[in-house]
Regions:
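Extracellular glycan-modifying ectodomains
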Residues: 1-390
């Protein structure tokens, strides 16, 4: 046997090595011909793009290679399938009770793994509490605060045994005291949600409450303010199946049960304003309450109020005006207010860069409602604007 034949024979003595080499070579070639994606709809996140070679001189080699490593990770061919495979191995083969930072609970419920406040939240939570106090003091008797607990606080028995979770109750108790001491009303929804926990009040695969959970909280607000609540039986109920939320995007468990979105067929108009300064804008685009085109894409919850706009106005069927200062928990809540108010103005500080005093002065609101999940409240870097005078 000549030397060439011996070398060839020795190579084929390592079939596993050959298989791995061919696999990674094929993956490399597939990456070369697969177009980069700007956005992952499944993960609801922006994906890294190829860093410019100019970064070498501008930022140094270390930053360039860090950016390039992240780019390769985000743009690997079949990324969604690799994530799903990893989750399957972790949950089915290794029998883990968490995947992608999500705790896998009973009744197919998913919970975020939140063991305590992170360092940024230890600074943000006091700032946002102070903002609430300042708002309540400037508008005594008008400010209503509703902070919604996470599903894990209502369903602790469904959380995997021994999983340490943030004790939201102690923070909510302190916030209730602070709001009331400052002249506001704290609308505590914890007991109401607990009373209805046998119903479908939180999504299994998403961090939001359902329209049913929001309705029970809305009824509590009506009781607090002496209002007659929206009557669901007087309206046509619509549903959209096949909703996989943010928890599923992280966990990617193969046997996850999809959620169902429920909403009511309401004819009310929604005007989304172009905001360029404090106060009431003049220009806006008028549409309906729901962006039903979103029901055909992955993030179906974004259909409520057309997402998180900086300032919008819902035309209601009642009297008076209310300003809702909110995160996305309010998106499925606000339509119920059409039964009570003529104008429901909605502010989301993620896209509204001003204080509230000019807007409030322009519109002379009867009530203000601050509606956030506690998870968002403790981490929102923009809510401080609610406390800024002027």
């Amino acid at each position: 046997m000549d030397k060439h034949s011996k070398r060839s024979a020795s190579i084929f003595r390592y079939p596993v090595l050959i298989a791995f080499t061919l696999f990674f070579a094929g993956l490399f070639l597939l990456d070369l011909v697969t177009p980069d994606r700007a956005y992952s709809e499944l993960e609801n996140t922006t994906l890294s793009q190829r860093p410019s070679l100019s970064s070498v001189s501008a930022d140094g080699l270390n930053k360039f290679f860090t950016a390039y490593t992240k780019y390769v990770k985000d743009q690997v061919a079949g990324r969604d399938n690799w994530i799903a495979l990893q989750s399957t191995v972790e949950t089915k083969v290794m029998q883990k009770e968490q995947s992608g930072g999500i705790l896998l609970g009973k009744q197919q419920m998913m919970f975020p793994r939140t063991y305590g406040l992170v360092s940024s939240e230890t600074r943000t939570l006091p700032k946002n509490t102070a903002a609430l106090e300042a708002l309540c003091q400037r508008y005594p008797g008008k400010v209503n605060v509703m902070l919604v607990p996470a599903a894990s606080a209502i369903y602790p028995e469904s959380v995997p045994a021994g999983a340490p979770l943030l004790d939201e109750d102690c923070y909510l108790d302190s916030l209730s005291d602070a709001v009331q001491a400052a002249g506001g009303r704290f609308v505590d929804v914890r007991q109401t949600l607990t009373d209805h926990k046998d119903e479908y009040i939180y999504y299994r695969t998403d961090h939001h409450w359902t329209s049913t959970g929001a309705y029970y909280a809305y009824k509590l607000l009506c009781d607090t303010l002496g209002l007659t609540p929206f009557d669901p039986s007087a309206h046509t109920v619509l549903t959209a199946d096949g909703f996989y939320g943010t928890h599923y995007s992280k966990a990617r468990t193969p046997d996850a049960e999809p959620d169902t979105i429920t909403y009511y067929d309401l004819p009310n108009e929604l005007t989304i304003y172009s905001v360029s300064g404090p106060g009431q804008p003049a220009d806006g685009e008028t549409t309906g309450l729901y962006d039903t085109a979103k029901l055909d894409v992955y993030d179906k919850y974004a259909m409520f109020l057309h997402g998180n706009n900086g300032l919008s106005r819902i035309k209601g069927d009642g009297t008076g005006r209310i300003l809702v200062i909110k995160d996305s928990y309010a998106n499925c809540f606000a339509p119920y207010l059409t039964a009570n108010y003529a104008d429901i103005d909605v502010v989301d500080f993620r896209n509204y860069n001003y204080g509230l005093d000019k807007l409030i002065a322009d519109n002379d609101y009867d009530q203000l409602l601050v509606l956030y999940s506690f998870d968002s409240f403790k981490s929102d870097p923009y809510l401080y604007r609610a406390g800024v005078a002027g």
